[in-house]
């Protein structure tokens, strides 16, 4: 079984060797689904189109991605309603739809468009939610995500996450690109491009900044970049290696891993940089810090027991407590937004899989298959887990429901993706 030092070397090697060309477009493919999904029909909106905004494909993709919905084909029903009065409920009930989303697009003053939508309960024949949005046509995609959020919340009772963003690193030839995109892969932006590895992107809690590690200085340095202005600053450039940035929940601090004392150890620094405070004193290797949602604890990986395991320690220092006990190789911890569930990577029988652990009961659940999965992170509502994994010779994005009931593949066409991170609700 490899040591934690070998694991750290492996992370660097993987960052330098992931190959393949990449495009920003994602292709959503349903690869598994639970039996209890809500059946919904999303009828094409009246007068939507390329210039007015193709809304329904975005809404359908969002709902499919969530794993909570089963899409009913509206073309099989002899009813195309745009307003509630036109819905013929018996036809939709016969088609197996539990709810139906309808809407229309109209021209508005100043070159804007007005998008109206309603979500109707088929059995009760009443409106569940709805809304109207007046925007410029180029904002129609964001409106479609907002509509999907409203539908998701009306059906599940949980806040939707479709207007959040993803960050990930793409490798094309000898070029690395740190990118952000919508949850469906559209509106992608390259934040940084380099011929040297870029790893470990981490979102600030307000969504304005991304911390990451760049090797452009011929060694790992932690940077923080303002997404609005593009300005960046080195916040950890100490002697030796600087890596694994993780934001505190209030955005004021970063946990980082430094080798200034020899072995990899966890330090706390200001988000603006400055002096580093060592969190613990341990003769082994400590790495991959992650704050608890309330900011009181730091979860991390250590080889102090002989093999890589996950521990937690108070943010102001103290005794570390071991968290994972099953298996002898557990890394990459991330906490759910409510602090009740931990996801991480376990190595078993030569395969690296995403695991979920209830922190109250210590019960575990397998969330991924494939031979090599990495870097799990929760959606901001805690209902989905994002990670990358191997598929067909490439590394692609997957999103699994937190209960393991369904999974979707978000394949970057003709490319490989690594180090994904799901952004927060309050994106700018």
Predicted regions and their residues:
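Amphipathic beta-strand/beta-sheet edge segments enriched in Tyr/Trp
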Residues: 26, 84-150
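Structural motif
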Residues: 111-114, 174-179, 219-223, 263-267, ...
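Hydrophobic beta-strand positions that form the internal "hydrophobic ladder"
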Residues: 166, 207-210, 251-255, 295-298, ...
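Multi-bladed beta-propeller domains
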Residues: 182-199, 225-243, 269-285, 313-329, ...
């Amino acid at each position: 079984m490899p040591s934690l030092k070998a694991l750290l070397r492996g992370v660097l090697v993987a960052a330098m060797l992931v190959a393949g060309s990449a495009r920003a477009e994602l292709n959503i493919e349903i690869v598994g689904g639970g039996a209890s999904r809500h059946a919904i029909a999303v009828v094409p909106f009246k007068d939507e189109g390329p210039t007015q905004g193709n809304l329904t494909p975005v809404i359908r993709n969002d709902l499919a991605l969530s794993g909570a919905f089963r899409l009913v084909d509206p073309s099989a029903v002899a009813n195309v309603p745009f307003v509630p009065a036109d819905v013929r409920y018996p036809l939709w009930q016969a088609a197996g739809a539990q709810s139906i989303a309808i809407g229309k697009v109209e021209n508005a003053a100043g070159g804007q468009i007005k998008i109206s939508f309603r979500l109707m309960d088929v059995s009760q024949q009443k409106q569940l939610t709805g809304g109207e949005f007046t925007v410029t046509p180029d904002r129609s995609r964001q409106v479609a995500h907002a509509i999907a959020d409203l539908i998701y919340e009306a059906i599940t009772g949980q806040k939707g996450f479709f207007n959040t963003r993803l960050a990930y690193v793409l490798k094309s030839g000898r070029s690395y690109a740190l990118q952000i995109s919508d949850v469906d892969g559209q509106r992608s932006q390259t934040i940084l491009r380099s011929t040297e590895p870029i790893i470990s992107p981490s979102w600030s809690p307000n969504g304005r900044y991304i911390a990451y590690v760049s090797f452009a200085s011929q060694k790992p340095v932690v940077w923080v970049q303002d997404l609005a202005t593009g300005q960046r600053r080195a916040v950890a450039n100490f002697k030796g290696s600087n890596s694994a940035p993780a934001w505190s929940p209030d955005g004021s601090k970063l946990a980082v891993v430094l080798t200034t004392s020899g072995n990899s150890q966890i330090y706390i620094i200001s988000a603006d940089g400055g002096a580093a405070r060592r969190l613990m004193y341990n003769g082994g290797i400590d790495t991959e810090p992650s704050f608890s949602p309330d900011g009181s604890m730091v979860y991390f990986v250590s080889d102090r027991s002989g093999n890589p395991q996950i521990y937690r320690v108070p943010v102001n220092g103290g005794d570390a407590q071991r968290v994972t006990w099953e298996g002898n190789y557990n890394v990459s911890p991330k906490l759910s937004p409510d602090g009740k569930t931990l996801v991480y990577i376990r190595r078993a029988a030569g395969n690296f899989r995403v695991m979920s652990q209830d922190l109250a009961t210590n019960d575990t659940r397998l969330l991924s298959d494939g031979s090599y999965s990495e870097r799990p992170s929760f959606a901001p509502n805690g209902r989905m887990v994002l990670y990358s994994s191997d598929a067909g010779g490439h590394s692609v994005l997957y999103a699994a429901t937190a209960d393991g009931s369904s999974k979707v593949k978000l394949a970057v066409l003709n490319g490989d993706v690594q180090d994904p991170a799901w952004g927060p609700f309050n994106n700018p």
